[in-house]
Amino acid sequence: APKVLYQEGESETAIYAVRSAGINPATGEEGFIKKNGAYTLVYDSNDKVVVGDETPVLEGAILPMLSYKGWSLNLSMMYRFGGQVYNLTRAINVENVNPRHNVDRRAFDERWKKVNDIPPYLDIANADSRTSIHTSRFVEDDNTLEVKTITVAYEFNPELLKSIGFKRLRVSVGMNDPFRLSTIKYERGTSYPFSRGFVFSISPTF
């Protein structure tokens, strides 16, 4: 990922990278835009400028709860809109991957191969030597809506429980991270293992 930089007057969560002029369909080379606006084929880290900000414009939580005739549904939802991220999955695991190892299929299927190709990724040749290049091609808008937890429960009618000696009986099933909708496609669980889990519970009262 690009190094964290701090400049007077800029956000502390600003993303700094060299602006990309895109991939030349004729040669497969990436062009860059220098600080002064000139175009070049030579990458220079001194040309890094602010190309995004990780702080979202809008961020929050939605906690809806519905109930009907003993049934209840609880959701915990998070949303964020208006920020940007540097997509490390695309930068490291697709474009700059070591071709001698197992790779994402996009590294082969969506790369530049011949004249007039207009792909999202550079030629895989010498890919593992480009890891220190940070360009705006990998900065993406981060608009995300995710359901963190969902719980469905049912509480039995107390009148029906008297015959078995219960005053109350509630059963529930829950799941974490069941749904995620995002403008960004990236690998999850690289810094901390990602997993989905189910929880089933029975809560009797005698």
Task: Annotate each language-model stretch with its function.
Residues I150, Y154, F194-F206:
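Outer-membrane beta-barrel "beta-signal"
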Residues S67, M78-R80, G174-P178, T205:
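Outer-membrane beta-barrel pore domains and translocons
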Residues A1-V4, R90-P99, I184-F194:
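Flexible, surface-exposed loop regions and adjacent strand-edge segments
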Residues G70-L75, E159-K162, F198:
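Repeated loop/turn-to-beta-strand initiation elements of outer-membrane beta-barrel proteins
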Residues L75, V171-V173, I202:
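Membrane-embedded beta-strand positions of outer-membrane beta-barrel proteins
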Residues P25, R80-L169, M175:
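Extracytoplasmic gating/loop element in the C-terminal half of outer-membrane beta-barrel translocons
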Residues P56-G60, N143-K148, F194-F198:
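Residues that define the transmembrane beta-barrel architecture of outer-membrane proteins
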Residues A1-E54:
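Conserved small-residue
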